[in-house]
């Protein structure tokens, strides 16, 4: 038994693809204790998904396939552009292994407009309290 897994960030980008012949728990634990990827990668993970394969060779081939398909930011270039002349007839479904963060919901406005509105409202509330409430 072996696995191909991927890290997905809060913006739904696939940022890393890997494979393992270990249990998912052991491999993911290694990533988060002595991982080889930048800390920025691990901090941006929203969830981890995987596909189970019958053999280690299947998982390795599919790792290269998915790296070439998705071009994840944190995969090394030596795996990319390894041209595979295979056809994947029936792609398996990815299963969620672990959710690290809730999906990113953005409330930010461009150029800090929301920040200016909040500061303006605070300033007006202080002004009203100090000068108009008398």
What are these regions (language model features)?
Residues 1-15, 21-104:
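Structure-specific nucleic-acid interaction/processing domains
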Residues 102-134:
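C-terminal single-pass membrane-anchor helix
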């Amino acid at each position: 038994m072996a696995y191909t897994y991927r890290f997905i960030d809060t913006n739904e980008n696939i940022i890393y693809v890997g494979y393992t012949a270990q249990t998912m728990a052991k491999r993911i634990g290694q990533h988060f204790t002595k991982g080889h990827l930048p800390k920025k990668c691990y901090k941006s993970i929203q969830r981890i998904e995987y596909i189970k394969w019958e053999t280690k060779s299947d998982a390795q081939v599919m790792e290269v396939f998915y790296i070439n398909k998705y071009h994840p930011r944190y995969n090394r270039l030596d795996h990319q552009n390894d041209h595979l002349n295979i056809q994947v007839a029936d792609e398996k479904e990815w299963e969620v292994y672990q959710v690290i963060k809730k999906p990113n919901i953005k409330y930010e406005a461009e150029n800090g407009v929301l920040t200016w509105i909040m500061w303006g409202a605070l300033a007006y509330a202080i002004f009203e309290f100090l000068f108009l409430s008398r």
